[in-house]
Amino acid sequence: MLDIRKESSRMITYDQHPDSCYIIQPLIYEKSIEFRTYQNNIAESAYDKNTLVVLPTALGKTIVAIMVTANALYNYKHKRVLVVAPTRPLVLQHMRSFYSVLKISQDKIAEITGKTPPLPRTAIWNNKDIRLVFATPEVVRNDLQD
């Protein structure tokens, strides 16, 4: 078994087994994300700077986002991550994907779409305990303007 760990706690580590390897990160469930070098490289790059990830369907853009999110939530314990998706169904899909692999309680995750009334949206934005928000761009724009 080869255990690769970076000096900085912000970096993703992985455990290499003869038949498979998995991402090891305190906020990611054990053996829930298989390690892929290209995803790890993109995630490490995206952690330090703005990054546009363009990959064909089913090559793991969501996994890269989960890896970056896990590191941000772990290293910045009083901050929140905003995940923006163009449609409500995609917001819900991302929320389910993140929740299935991240060790984060459901009360720390929120969804804000056009179906969320204004008062609950304000409560979500003001709730410091919510660490992960999934929203559509229109709602974010409208709430910033109000």
Predicted regions and their residues:
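N-terminal helicase ATP-binding lobe
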Residues: 1-146
